[in-house]
């Protein structure tokens, strides 16, 4: 937020659009909200238009409500801030931009809305003007939905957006960067993503978007993705094998993967180790100082590592077949082969590894099993 005034000046921005979820209504602090509105005030006379989303929904005791904000803070909303306060799409005109009509609405509750708002918006007050919509909703493209991990709300399709009468749609809800362009290459709608990544579900690209809206969209040459996040959150998988038997060798493989992917010194990284390792390898240990030259913070998850037990040799060994370990492996192999689905196989394989660890006198270590199962 503190970098916003400089960005506005540098790019000669005429209006700032915020399509929702600036905060989480259930936990937002007075400090956060006032910092936000103070930053918007510094942009004056450039107008800022806000369309409250499902997380920062509008209600009588919302900081978006002018009277409540004044009672809580002792001051008014900045004069350059405009908030859509109706759950029904309405138009907004700003004296500074008389040739532009802005449209938008607000959420009043944090609940999914199934109405396809965009498909029903076909009539404009002044079609000859530039017409811009702020929409907090879900692109219902299958891949976009899967990667977002979010419930569908105010769903729309690419086809519905491209067929709409709006020259540009500022999109909010998904925390990753997505653009929707017409056949001429002009951008008709875009999610900037969350400006500052905060979790493992926000490892994708995310920007503040700047562009010149014209009739028919934003030309690709006038569309800029600007990163204001000084660091990135990574989720990196590092494959190990039986040859890696000590923590130093494991760290060197992690460091090589960091270099390959371009992890920076200010970044935070969640590292998932996976693969079949020597059965006598119980766990790898790392000192936080090991990572200081590579990144700001790192967490290592070893739950996907599996001991590379030679099950075929155990089953072929006549002596083992008469012992508990051989009988256990044979029984578990039969259970796995007759499992009804992959989820059941995964659980049974974890049970096999737990059992072999116990029979070999090794510590029982948590094995990865998909949380859905």
Residue ranges of model-derived segments:
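His/Asp/Glu-rich metal-coordinating catalytic cores
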Residues: 15, 24-199, 204-207, 212
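Short loop/turn segments immediately following beta-strands, especially the blade-tip
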Residues: 214-216
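A generic secondary-structure signal
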Residues: 3-11, 39, 120-123, 253-260
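Short, surface-exposed connector motifs at secondary-structure boundaries
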Residues: 19, 45-50, 265-268
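Conserved residues at the C-terminal ends of beta-strands
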Residues: 19, 172, 274
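N-terminal active-site segment of His-dependent metallophosphoesterases
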Residues: 1-35, 349-353, 361-373
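Accessory, non-catalytic peripheral segments of nucleic-acid enzymes
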Residues: 10-11, 218-373
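Short acidic, S/G/P-rich loop/turn micro-motifs used as interaction or catalytic elements
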Residues: 23, 109-110, 276-281
């Amino acid at each position: 937020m503190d970098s916003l005034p400089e960005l506005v000046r540098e790019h000669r921005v005429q209006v700032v659009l915020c399509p929702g979820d600036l905060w989480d209504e259930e936990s937002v602090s007075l400090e956060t909200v006032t910092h936000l509105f103070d930053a918007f005030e510094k942009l004056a006379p450039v107008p800022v238009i806000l369309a409250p989303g499902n997380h920062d929904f509008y209600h009588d005791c919302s900081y978006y409500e002018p009277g409540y904000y004044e009672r809580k803070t002792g001051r008014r909303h900045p004069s350059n801030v405009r908030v859509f306060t109706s759950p029904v799409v309405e138009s907004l005109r700003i004296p500074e931009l008389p040739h532009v009509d802005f449209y938008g609405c607000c959420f009043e509750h944090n609940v999914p809305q199934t109405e396809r708002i965009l498909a029903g918006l076909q009539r404009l007050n002044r079609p000859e003007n530039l017409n811009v919509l702020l929409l907090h909703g879900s692109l219902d493209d299958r891949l976009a939905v899967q990667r977002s991990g979010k419930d569908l709300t105010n769903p729309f399709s690419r086809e519905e957006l491209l067929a709409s009468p709006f020259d540009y749609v500022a999109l909010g809800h998904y925390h990753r960067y997505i653009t929707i362009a017409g056949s001429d290459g002009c951008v008709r709608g875009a999610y900037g993503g969350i400006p500052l990544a905060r979790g493992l579900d926000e490892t994708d690209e995310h920007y503040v978007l700047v562009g010149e809206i014209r009739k028919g969209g934003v030309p690709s040459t006038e569309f800029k993705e600007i990163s204001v996040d000084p660091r990135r959150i990574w989720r990196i998988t590092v494959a190990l094998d039986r040859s890696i038997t000590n923590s130093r060798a494991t760290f060197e493989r992690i460091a090589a993967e960091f270099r390959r992917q371009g992890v920076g010194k200010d970044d935070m990284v969640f590292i998932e180790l996976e693969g079949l390792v020597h059965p006598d390898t119980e766990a790898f240990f790392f000192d936080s100082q090991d990572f200081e030259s590579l990144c700001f913070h790192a967490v290592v998850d070893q739950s996907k590592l599996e001991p590379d037990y030679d099950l075929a040799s155990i089953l072929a060994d006549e002596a083992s077949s008469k012992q508990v370990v051989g009988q256990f492996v044979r029984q578990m192999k039969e259970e796995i082969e007759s499992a009804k689905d992959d989820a059941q196989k995964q659980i049974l394989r974890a049970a096999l590894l737990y059992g072999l660890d116990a029979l070999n006198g090794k510590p029982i270590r948590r094995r990865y099993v998909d949380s859905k199962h």
